[in-house]
Swiss-Prot record:
It is an enzyme of class 1 (oxidoreductase). Gene3D superfamilies: Electron Transport, Fmn-binding Protein, Chain A (2.30.110.10). Binds 1 FMN per subunit. PANTHER family: PYRIDOXINE-5'-PHOSPHATE OXIDASE, PYRIDOXINE-5-PHOSPHATE OXIDASE. It comes from Chelativorans sp. (strain BNC1). The keyword Cell membrane does not apply. This is Pyridoxine/pyridoxamine 5'-phosphate oxidase. Keywords: Flavoprotein, FMN, Oxidoreductase, Pyridoxine biosynthesis. The gene is pdxH. Coiled coil: none annotated. Its cofactor is FMN. InterPro entries: Pyridox_Oxase, Pyridox_Oxase_CS, Pyridox_Oxase_N, Pyridoxamine_oxidase_dimer_C, Split_barrel_FMN-bd. Pathway: Cofactor metabolism; pyridoxal 5'-phosphate salvage; pyridoxal 5'-phosphate from pyridoxamine 5'-phosphate: step 1/1; Cofactor metabolism; pyridoxal 5'-phosphate salvage; pyridoxal 5'-phosphate from pyridoxine 5'-phosphate: step 1/1.
Amino acid sequence: MSRTMIKNDLKQTDFTEAGEPFRLFAEWLRDAEQSEPNDPNATALATVDPEGMPNVRMVLLKGFDEQGFVFYTNFESAKGQEILSSMKAAMCFHWKSLRRQVRVRGPVEKVTDEEANAYYASRPRGSRIGAWASKQSRPLEGRFALEKAVAEYTAKYAVGEIPRPDYWSGFRIKPVSIEFWHDRPFRLHDRILFERESGGLWTKTRLYP
């Protein structure tokens, strides 16, 4: 039996023994890191614009704990502006190799400057230059304009540290609900919904597929 087949043989006790969602998410993410061909931390991030039109795109999860799920972006981008307008978002992880999915919904907060600085400093130098060079989501007259901006900022920051732009930071989704989904034959899937109560405790409900 292959490793993927073993991982897919998820038993009901795997859900019922989980008293809270974060440990279960950590286990599933570790499994994905072993089975997904690339970017196991990729997630579809959903936002809404001021007119109520939804928007979705892939981002990379850069951290999580009981406080929430963290990703980084340009605050002047479309997603940055939409989040700043509503301060709400949702994300969906789908690991095809494991036939598993996790949905997260909740209000959003900015990460601290200390968190943003630490993560920004850990990025490759080229990515830090890119944060300055790219006017994310705005019209680009041609690839040459982007390459020119990269060259200019590369020269500007040729020596020393590259500071983090004020407009580049991170968001944390503070989940009010986290749903775990596992594929079953004949579409009789397992779905477990965790919902956070006002006191911070989690309730757990099994849902029809």
